[in-house]
Curated annotation (Swiss-Prot):
Organism listed in the record: Mycobacterium sp. (strain JLS)
Annotated SUPFAM superfamilies: Aldolase, post-HMGL domain-like
Keyword match Lyase: yes
Enzyme type, top EC level: lyase
InterPro entries documented for this protein: 2-IPM_HCS-like, 4OH_2_O-val_aldolase, Aldolase_TIM, DmpG_comm, DRE_TIM_HOA, PYR_CT
Gene3D superfamilies: 1.10.8.60, Aldolase class I
Domain Pyruvate carboxyltransferase: 13-265
Name of the protein this chain belongs to: 4-hydroxy-2-oxovalerate aldolase 1
Amino acid sequence: MTSDIFFDPIWDVRMTDTSLRDGSHHKRHQFTKDEVGAIVAALDTAGVPVIEVTHGDGLGGSSFNYGFSKTPEQELIKLAAETAKEAKIAFLMLPGVGTKEDIKEAQNNGGSICRIATHCTEADVSIQHFGLARELGLETVGFLMMSHTIPPEKLAQQARIMADAGCQCVYVVDSAGALVLEGVRDRVAALVAELGDDAQVGFHGHENLGLGVANSVEAVRAGAKQIDGSCRRFGAGAGNAPVEALIGVFDKIGVKTGIDFFDIADAAEEVVAPAMPAECLLDRNALIMGYSGVYSSFLKHAIRQSERYGVPAHQLLHRAGQRKLIGGQEDQLIDIALEIKREMESDAAGRQSHAIGGSPRKG
């Protein structure tokens, strides 16, 4: 099933740039056509083989819950496909958010790689979507999100479900940036052992603990054949592994990608950076997400609720991790914010009462 994957024989690894999908979280889904056209052209020139374009939460993600897109994603997919001369355009879809009709429309607009994402314990909800994508002649990729939350052997079982449904490459997806080196290696190795020649294995990392590049190297050494990254770390949380750094490292250790290091460095500096609202930072909030295992796209939602209710964003994120919230449960941040606000008000009232009453006098 891997024989018809878009994979040049000269590559050791196929890179996918997710700046125009994962980066949508950081940009609050406000990409313009000019920005997308310029970024696709620069990435294509640098030799990036696959460019992912969609709302941050995939097809159909433009909504009150996830955030509305400035420009309809299908228009951006079409523009990207028309702009790229060599690169293939990928799109993400989450069952329950996107629909089968969205997949068909994305293909009609020039998308050729369908990436279907589920929580890492729910691969079964993707079966019909993989079936449709293969019927349509699309290349398929599966995302097992929040892969840090279950052990390697169980993750491999979920990967088998996707592969049997028609998935040609199953990704270990470190949505929270919580995995550390051997955690990546063990999970990728487990999937490679389970899937064999039935499907490739990929890795998607985040920088919330500063390990996006190192974890990607571990993944390749464990047998991963597809790796994600975003120029300038343009992604959710502290961002994704920076493609330009990945290419520099891969060049040094002899991993062939077909991407020119200097061209991708130019693209990151001169084209992608100007489109970013700010740099993706490894700050306290991002660190808390990596440390506590919080889905990276929660960052902007937590900041918004922090400002709305006057509570610390990092406390919101830590409690989200304690409650093991997953993608799609962003609305629960409101409940947590109200809970923290009540606690803060109760503590303040207690301190005021103590100050008024003073300390009892000794007789």
